[in-house]
Regions:
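Conserved ABC ATPase "signature" region
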Residues: 1-7, 34, 55-58
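Conserved ABC ATPase signature
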Residues: 11-15
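Walker B catalytic motif
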Residues: 40-41
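Helical segment within the ABC ATPase nucleotide-binding domain
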Residues: 51-63
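H-loop/switch region of ABC-family ATPase nucleotide-binding domains
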Residues: 72-73
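A short, surface-exposed alpha-helical micro-motif characterized by mixed small hydrophobic
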Residues: 78-80
Length: 126
């Protein structure tokens, strides 16, 4: 399912970041978790392995009914996986909707590409 048998005999310290994330998904499957939280799946992972991870997430959702809560900055990756999308900043929901809706939301753009939410709030209070 996850095509990780080729790394079965390798020490954990010798496999790549993406391979470690695939092993983590495999461990999730072993305990049959129905809700899975993934933090920064794409961090340090090459695009090929990220696509493999994304394919596995989609299959686990469709075939086994797993629900995923994914924390990720790569909106292209998220677009493959999630609908709806919720964007948070400073511990609060900033926007929610389709990937296109949140990518074009002025608050999201300002928080992540502009001066940042904290600075904007400080300026408004002054």
């Amino acid at each position: 399912f996850l095509t990780i048998s080729h790394i079965a005999d390798q020490k954990a310290g010798m496999i790549s970041g993406g391979q470690k994330k695939l092993v983590e998904l495999g461990r999730t499957m072993m305990v049959d978790a129905k809700i899975v939280f993934l933090d920064e799946v794409g961090a340090g992972v090459n695009r090929t392995l990220l696509n493999t991870i994304g394919d596995a997430i989609v299959r686990l959702n469709k075939e086994r009914g797993y629900t995923f809560c994914v924390i990720e900055h790569d909106m292209d990756f998220i677009a493959r996986l999630c609908d709806p999308v919720i964007v948070m900043a400073e511990g609060k929901v900033l926007a929610q909707g389709t990937v296109d809706e949140v990518k074009n939301d002025e608050r999201v753009i300002e928080a992540y590409l502009g001066r940042g939410l904290k600075n904007k709030l400080k300026e408004g209070a002054a």
